[in-house]
């Protein structure tokens, strides 16, 4: 009986995909965040400075880290501050 219950628990976890979902900031307002899609395992922060003393920051989820100069990636919840 115990073996049957253990098997059912394992099957439930496998089939329901109780996996971890990443949360990333997505705007200038650090109180806002988004739950990433299953294939998006990285948070990114892209900083663009078109003019002196003027900065544009983009944040969000990504499946991989772009190899751009001003992109910082991380893989824990809300790490892209």
Curated annotation (Swiss-Prot):
Keyword Disulfide bond: yes
Example of a GO MF term: toxin activity
Compartment list: Secreted
Keyword Iron in record: no
Superkingdom of the source species: Eukaryota
Organism: Oxyuranus microlepidotus (Inland taipan)
Pfam families: Toxin_cobra-type
SS bond list: 24-43, 36-61, 65-73, 74-79
Tissue specificity comment: Expressed by the venom gland.
Name assigned to this protein: Three-finger toxin 3FTx-Oxy6
Alphabetic keyword roster: Disulfide bond, Secreted, Signal, Toxin
InterPro entries listed in its UniProt record: Snake_3FTx, Snake_toxin-like_sf, Toxin_cobra-type
Principal subcellular localization: secreted
GO cellular component: extracellular region
Family: Belongs to the three-finger toxin family. Short-chain subfamily.
Signal peptide: 1-21
């Amino acid at each position: 009986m115990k073996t049957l219950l253990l098997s059912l628990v394992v099957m439930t976890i496998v089939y329901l995909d109780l996996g971890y979902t990443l949360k990333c900031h997505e705007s200038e307002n650090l109180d806002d965040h988004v739950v990433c899609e299953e294939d998006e395992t990285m948070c990114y922060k892209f900083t663009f400075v078109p003019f002196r003393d003027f900065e544009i920051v983009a944040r969000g989820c990504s499946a991989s880290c772009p190899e751009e100069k001003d992109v910082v990636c991380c893989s824990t919840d809300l790490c892209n501050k």
